[in-house]
Amino acid sequence: MKSGLLTCLVFACVVASAQSTPVGGVASEWDVRKLLESLDLQAQHVKPIIDQVKPQTWVAKGAPQAYVTQWTTAQAELKYLLASSESLSKEPERLTLALDTYFRMQALELTLASVTEGIRKYQNPALADLMQAVVSENGSNADKLRQYVQDLATQKEQEFQIADREAQRCRETLMKQPAAPIKGVRK
């Protein structure tokens, strides 16, 4: 019984050390924070451009009402991206936050692509080019974030596999040990 407890204690130490040290290729917290700062800076460059967009006037020129909705969505998605990025910066080891940030970035880029076409057609082609350039500048950050999410997911999967193997080994060790004798009650 004591060896089973010792084995489980060793297992707990192994899992704790596996979680505190990065596994092959996962970016350090410092690098992730730098990446997120760069992502936030690029996102902040989008805001003044979005503020110049006037999709309500486009509708008078024959544009679909959907552009107004997309513009409103882009404003909200920008706020969500910045909030998600801030949360990830505080806890860069959380896969759910990394995925949320990445998906919000993709959603913003897709919405802005449509809004950019509206800007080009109904407002100002130069402003559309500026929007497209700012979004394109963020491509490197998007690739780095995608790679970080992939590396983090791989690390978490490896940690889970180690923990699962060790738990199975502990269970097996405990099952092989004879049951402790039941001590009789003294009278």
Task: Please provide the spans of the model-predicted regions.
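Alpha-helical segments in soluble extracytoplasmic regions
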Residues: Q42-Q106, T111
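Surface-exposed, polar helix/loop patches in the mature regions of secreted/periplasmic/lumenal proteins
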Residues: E86-D143
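C-terminal amphipathic alpha-helix
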Residues: G24-T57, I119-K187
